Amino acid sequence: MSFDKQNLIWIDLEMTGLDPEKERIIEIATIVTDKNLNILAEGPVLAVHQSDELLNKMNDWCQKTHSENGLIERVKASKLTERAAELQTLDFLKKWVPKGASPICGNSIAQDKRFLVKYMPDLADYFHYRHLDVSTLKELAARWKPEILEGFKKENTHLALDDIRESIKELAYYREHFMKLD
């Protein structure tokens, strides 16, 4: 194990929709990497129980996607509350990264952060205030060097752990083909 303030916390949430005032978290996963994007540990992958009423109100895209990937069934079978999932995630992170050291890392991570602030505030407070958002590089590449976008394809399973792994690979791809640090 390598507890280090340079380690990066990667997180992804799946939600019932995009509005944190109306929607809720249904899955959370985390991965810790070192500063060079080498995976050190995968945290718990947790389906968060939500009511049938809330699940039935999801839009067509969410219904289709989360049915096809099995997430709705996992959510229905889960007994975990958002608070329990938050505490399990924090227990994992405390073994790898000190509080306030890592930016929140992922793709379109500001959206996840909005839900964390509302439903998992202790976890939201664990991160540094900065964001490491892979989608920023994708947007810049689309404008400045669009040809490199064709070299990275996502699976788009919309399962939290898969999405994090893809985000890490995507950042490594941009580091090699767009940023060229060598």
Swiss-Prot record:
Asked if the keyword Hydrolase belongs to this entry, the reply reads: yes
Q: Which keywords has UniProt assigned to this entry?
A: Cytoplasm, Exonuclease, Hydrolase, Nuclease
Q: What class of enzyme is it?
A: hydrolase
Localization annotation = Cytoplasm
Query: Superkingdom of this entry's organism?
Result: Bacteria
Q: Which InterPro entries match?
A: Exonuclease_RNaseT/DNA_pol3, Oligoribonuclease, RNaseH-like_sf, RNaseH_sf
Q: Which GO terms describe its biological process?
A: DNA metabolic process
Catalytic residues, chain numbering: Y129
Q: Which residues form the signal peptide?
A: none
Q: Which residues are connected by disulfide bridges in this protein?
A: none
Under Enzyme Commission nomenclature, its number is: 3.1.15.-
Q: Where in the numbering of this chain does the Exonuclease domain appear?
A: 8-171
Listed under GO cellular component are: cytoplasm
**Pfam families assigned:** RNase_T
The GO molecular function terms of this record are: 3'-5'-RNA exonuclease activity; nucleic acid binding
Its family remark reads: Belongs to the oligoribonuclease family.
Q: What does this protein do?
A: 3'-to-5' exoribonuclease specific for small oligoribonucleotides.
Q: List the NCBIfam families.
A: PRK05359.1
Query: What name appears for this protein in its UniProt entry?
Result: Oligoribonuclease
Which species is listed as the source?
Haemophilus influenzae (strain PittGG)
